[in-house]
Swiss-Prot record:
Name of the protein this chain belongs to: Focadhesin
One Gene Ontology cellular component: cytosol
SUPFAM superfamilies: ARM repeat (SSF48371)
Functional note: Required for the maintenance of SKIC2 and SKIC3 proteostatic levels in the liver. May be involved in the regulation of RNA degradation by the exosome complex. Potential tumor suppressor in gliomas.
Residue numbers bearing the N6-acetyllysine modification: 816
Gene Ontology annotations of biological process type: regulation of post-transcriptional gene silencing
Alphabetically ordered keywords of this record: Acetylation, Cell junction, Cytoplasm
Pfam families noted in UniProt: DUF3730 (PF12530), Focadhesin (PF11229)
Principal location: other
Organism: Mus musculus
UniProt subunit comment: Interacts with VCL.
Entry comment describing in which tissues the protein is expressed: Expressed by glial and neuronal cells in brain.
Protein's cellular compartments: Cell junction, Focal adhesion; Cytoplasm, Cytosol
Amino acid sequence: MSDDIKKRFDFPNSLIQSQAVGHLIAAVLKEHGVSEKIHQSTNQTAALNLLWEKCCSDHVVVRTACSEGLVALVAQGHAEFSYVLNGILNLTPSARNMSGLIKALMKLLQMQALREGQSGEKDIQDIYSIRNPPQPLITVLEHRPDCWPLLLQQLTAFFQQCPERSEASCVQIMAPFLWYLYCEPSQLEEYAKLRLSLLKVLLQPRGVCEEAQLSVREQSTLQLCCSMLPCLQMKDLMQTTEMMLFVEEVYLSLLRHPGFWKSQLTQLTLQLLCICEVSLKITGECSSLIHLLERSVELLGEDFPVELVIIGIALLLLQMPASQQKPLLNLALKLLSLTEGQKIPKASLLLLVPLLQILSSTALEDCLAMGEEGPSRQQLALSLVEVLQKERHGDDSHTISCRLAFPVSSMYGSIFTAWRILDVIGEESATSDWLATVESLLSATTVIPPHVFLLLAYLLVEDVGQNLQQILRVTTQLAQADSSQVPNLIPVLMFKLGRPLDPVSYNHILYTLPTLGVHKVCVGQILRVIQLLGTTPRLRAVTLRLLTSLWEKQDRVYPELQRFMAVSDAPSLSVGKELQWEKLIAKAASIRDICKQRPYQHGADMLAAISQVLNECTKPDQATPAALVLQGLHALCQAEVVCIRSTWNALSPKLSCDMRPLILKTLSELFSLVPSLTVNTVEYENFKVQVLSFLWTHTQNKNPTVASAAYKSLSHFSAGEHTILHLPEKIRPEMPVPGELDEEESVDLSIPGACFLRLLTITAPSVLPALEEFFTSLVRQEMVNMPRGIYHSALKGGVRSDQGKTVAGIPNFILKTYETNKQPGLKPGLAGGMLFCYDLAMYQSKDGKPLNRLMASRGRSFKQTTLALIHEVHVQLSEWHRAIFLPQAWLAYMTRAYHAILQGRIAELELQLQHGKEGPEEVQYKRSTAWLWVRDMLTDEITKTAAKESPVVKANALLALSSLAVVVSKHEASLCSDSDGVLEIQPNFLPVKEWVSMVLNTLLVIVDSHYHPSGQLFTCFYHKSYSGENTASAIARSAAATALSLLVPVFIISCKEKVEEILNMLTARLPGKPSADESQAVQIHMGLALGMFLSRLCEEKLSDMSGQQMNLLLMKSLDALESCCFDPSLEYNTGCILGVGLALSLMSHSSHTESRVHVAASLRKLSTYLDESGSQSRTFQEVLVYTLSCVCTSAFSAGIIEAAEAEDIMSKLQLLVENNQQTSGFALALGNLVYGLSVCGHGKAEDLGNRLRPSWIKVVLTEGAPTMLCLAALHGLVALVGSDVDVMQLKSEAIQNTHFQARLNEVIRTLTEVISVSGVIGLQSNAIWLLGHLHLSTLSSNQSRTSVPTDYSYLPEGSFIRAAIGFFITGGKKGPEAVPPSLLKVVMKPIATVGESYQYPPANLAALLSPLMRLNFGEEIQQLCLEIAVTQAPSSQSAASLLGLWVMPPLIHGLSLNIKKYLLVSMPLWAKHVSDEQIQGFVENLMVEVFKTASQPCHPEMCLSALQGLSQAMKLPSPSHHLWSLLCDATGRIFDLLPNRIRRNDLELYISIAKCLSEMTDEGVNQVSQITKDNIEKAAFVKLYLVSQGRLPLMSLTDLLTAAMQHPEKETLAWMILHSLYQARIVNHANTGVLKRLEWLLELMGYVRNIAYQSAPIQNVAPEEALDFLMLIFAAAVVAWADHEAPLLLGLSASWLPWHQQNGPGGPAAALLGRSPMHRVTVQEVLTQLPRSMLLLLQKEPWKEQTQKFIDWLLSIMEIPNKAFAAKSKDLLKATLLSLRVLPEFKKKAVWTRAYGW
């Protein structure tokens, strides 16, 4: 039978062939049975095989019938559907003829669609997929793409013949195939014809009439097409063309039923806009799409998305060729016409930029558009501009009715975000914020996105003045960042100029035009605009200035500038005087600018113009142009284009007599160049002299401006160039008469420092700031030229150099007498004289270098003499006068001896190096430790001597050792100043502090036998008694007690805490006390020692450096001493009386009022005591009289008592002397008093001295006069010339004149004559002692006794710093009534200013500044005092001590806010130099205290200052453990006190606290900023800031995100995180590098996946809420890291404070961070920008390498159950995936099918 059927198939007759097919099917049914279904596992019979074979037959009838037979078998239930379907698909790849199979396949699919659609049991869409299982037609097309015509044919029939009731099913069953055909990413060309042809079939309406009712098939098909549209590719020309055809067909189909498809039409309108942009870029054509948009305007009406389309039109117009613009302009006009009678949308103003660009374009473009119908582009543009100008603009507060979930391109995201930003920046504060953020980012980008530019142009057009300057500034910076925007900007500026504005705004806009000339291409357009302005006569002056500004940007404009300047010179009768004046001013200003900007290129061209202006402008009211061109001349001279001297020679005939203030001011400024242009010629030096004379003359000009300019110019000259001849005559010092000078001497014309200060008295208040600047230059120059050695010598102490020949000869005289003496009785006196003045000359070679051999010999001589003096100096406890000065004599001698021996040691080492006995390294080491070697050598020698010798030797040894301790300590301090405060520790030598402690402990053990020292002792000075106590001789105890006063400078430097201990010890041993010494002499010396100790503390100004507790202790000790002094029942209180005298004398110079009152009361008490002392011993009276003389002199010199009271006491002493002529103490006291009062200007005292001196000399030189009478006269004589001046701390320099020198020389000659001639041993011995004492007191400067000098008297007389400090002292003594604060400030400010850069030479700054701080000089003086203390604290312990007092309560509470702010900010400079207690008090009572308010800081500036100081202090290198702990604790406390919610104007506080935390360890940071419910916002901000700066790794954000998910205001935290992530990208740090960011983002994606699939637990928050927040953070990271375009639009900034200092404390600045409308929009629009940014990010390295991971993650998150993830978020993920459809990784079928939902 099969053979028969085969024959029939071959028979060429269709009827026979059809019958054969019927027979074959019957055979198949027979073979398989009627009841059994044919399926896959059924035996393949011959008939069945033949049937399958003939389905591919060459005969069309056979294959068609066979295929239909197979379908019939399925339809009748004889074969399974899947069997036949799979059989057809299996035959597809190899079949010769496919028509039958495809037809059968279509029949099967139709059958399946009908069956499944009717049953409704199974969703038809679930039957097939694109990939698994694939829709059968996909398989066919993939295997046989050549069969597309057959497919098209059958598909056409399929859709046309589809029953109405199954239309939806038929479309659904074809949906996978259609998705594959149109949306497959590769978009194969071989399918193109099928796609295009099939589209017409799909969208063909069912009815004949277009108005027919919408069929189900049509509805389903259009819905399918609309859903496919976002997935279509538009990568190349072919794809874009297909997309355009596709969207046109779909759009036209939708338009047939616009009412039904209103929503889709609205969405498709926006899609059309996006396609237009892509089409423009690829094809250059989009007019057909624009026509579609036009059609939908009428149809959609109010539902048309006008705002978004208008923004899109504006963007398209900017990038569209002119030929394409007309349809868009028509569309825009139609859109705006819809709103007639209503407010047009605010967004419509964005059209202005392209419209103005069209209007400003050339006519050439219109020539190219010839033949077009209707209005031209310019006419349309003009119509639109008119509409925009006439109509009012709406608020656009309504929301967009339709929002695209899946836009076809990124344009939609930009449009929508721009619309949102536009909506929110209408408010002034939001505008300012957005502009500030844009401004901060312009430096990071070179391409400005057009929508950002449009928004800026909108703001420029709409602004009414509030933000105009900011807008114009951003405009200028935008032009610099992207010069391609300039042509668009210029028409907008011109448009703005055409609107009504205030004159200032017009000016700002005009001067913005030249700043846009950033590229040569833009210059022509700007130049034309400026030239157009110049055609108006009233604007010619402005035009010239604009041209000059443009020339500054582009030198190529110079010819035009020259031409316009020449034209402006031409006289014009039509122009008024006012306009001529403006032109002249403009010309002069332009000349100045040309000279300043490019003096070398064009300066020479301007000389003629300068000369012309100077010649023309000679009248008083024409000074301004002349001054302007002189400024230009200033620039030419500065650039050395012209010679300043020659220039002045040419100008001086015209200008030397010019009295116009403005000209004089400008000339002074010109002359400030003279020092910097110096030429080494005589002519130039003469010129400089002329200039100086000119400037000094005009410092006294009555016009403050001229005088100020003169002083400012003088500040540029060297201080040495000013002479006393320059000074005004009123303040000029007396000049020496030339005839009185020696032949070799020249007249010294240098100005003493004090003379500069006299300028204060003749300077007008308004000129004082300029004088201050001049003083500052003097101070700075002096510090620059300050000799390095001055620091060393000042700390070391020294002698005055102004000694006469007679005084200088004393040491040699005593030395020769000592060496030739053969009388044992003279030995003690000679030893005393040697102690006071022994010194040997320094030996130097011809080149001024010391001779090493002789220096070594000098050192050995000093060593031998030291040991001899220890043995020979006589110590007698009963000699009270010598007891006062012996310690000081030893200190002066040991100072000379130590340095001489040290120099000798260094010289010996140099000799050893020269002779090769030592290597260079060994010598270098020994040189560096020589000062310690000398210390130890002398210590050994002194202690060895003291071990075996008498009590007198021990006493001298103690004084020598104590003096050595002082000298070594000072030397160490000077070394520290030389080595910037750091001395290398020497392991082979005992540290100085420990060695000094040994000396001190030894003294204390000797004074108090019960004292238990903590360290080692020098045991050679005492011995153990049987009871185990340390005992020493009375002389040793007395010497130890008085030696303690020598160590006061050491206590001040290193161990101030010992002061209290010593005061208590000495006070306890006063006469009459339970612990008083058994020895009467020791009791006397204890009182003297306490007085000496107190006097030295007063001399050190300890009360100015210490707190109230120390002052109370000093007064308590003084009270105890005075109690003993005035207690008549005590027998051995003469030492107390002397001690009181010494203490009160020094206390007189205190600035404390209570101290001065106390001195006055005690003086009167002493005077009364003297009156009542008739019954006392002669010694008692001598001591009392001497004490009275010292206190009286000091009190008078300090102004405590009047001249009359001093005269009364002087008369009382004179009477005593007359009645007791042989009493040395009385004569000494009277001489002392007369000298002191004379020095202080007491006339009667000077008269008395002139009478006493000759009478006493006569007594001394009278042969045979009684010895005691001569001795008294000798004491009186030396006192008359100041032998005891050191006790009273008088400045004897006041009478260092020739008359005083003559009197001094006369006394010295008298003493030497007594020593040489007298035969009385006792008289000779005393005379020698007195002569040495007089030498020391004449030469010594009291700075050698104090730890640091009390002032700068050791600086030369010409020193301005010395004079300034003297002025401070005067102010401190006389108060603000005598020294006005305004003048004091002029002197103090330079010292404070220069002190910031230099460390001043040593001085007791606490004593200098403390009175000024306490007296009522005002806040400014107080601050300057503290500024000096702060800057000098590193090198000045006294400054640090003063500062320490004022940074603690109670003093700190009395300071003003400004001073407190300064102390807070400057804390890093001084924190390491005050005590732990003081810095702790400062931190607790000020730094932390300012934050302690209920809700917000009461003084934001104070808080900010506190944090600035704290953050800088935490950066200090190597802080102490206490300081570091204190700072960390303060940081934590301040963080806790800051409000959780961050106000904008407080943001800097949080940044500052974050900077503080950044200095701590990670553990410390986490501990302080641990996130809790109450502090989450501030803790989050701090961590985010640290992450953004790279201080913390990005991975540390995990805990923050976990906490943030539970926070109710997540948007606030999201805003912070967004900014942090963006700034992490900008900051260059290892922790914020791109790989670290990639790692963190992948980690975040994993975290999100775990939460989505419930792998990671979350608490207190719904999963969908947590996922939404984390998706927002993911989007933030992607947007922040993809590019700068989206951040620029969104308002992200390059810093946390882009708006810094733009808003005051109120208004928008007070808003909470992250909560403003602008901030909310920023966060929300991050999601809109995600699809675009994700594509950009994955196209960059190294992100592109992880593209597959990102795609897989997006797919996995998108596919989680709906209830776990909101639909809106899923749409966002899908849109993001669709944006990646151009990437290679997306083209994998497994990827794109999942992305499309298949």
